[in-house]
Amino acid sequence: MADWHWEPVTDGLLDELPPAALAAVRQVAEELTVRESMTFLDGREFTGEPPGLRTVQRGPLMLVYLTDVRGERVVIIQVNWIG
């Protein structure tokens, strides 16, 4: 997985989430990070068109995220928790 990681777009994005939501965000974000590292093998050397904003939903969780291929990171833009 090289140096790939995930991070929220702002420091306080996850602050108000209940523990179950935070655990779900961490799990999904880790899975996305692994998947993206396997999809974009060139990482920092990537020269193609990067993907735009994407959404993933798991149960009561919906994440909007952006893959920064050259930065080898998944940036969580928005979190919705219906629970």
Task: For the regions a language model picked out, list residue spans one by one.
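Surface-exposed, Lys/Arg-rich phosphate-binding patches that contact polyanionic backbones
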Residues: G12-A23
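Residues that form generic nucleotide/phosphate-binding pockets
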Residues: L13, V28-E31
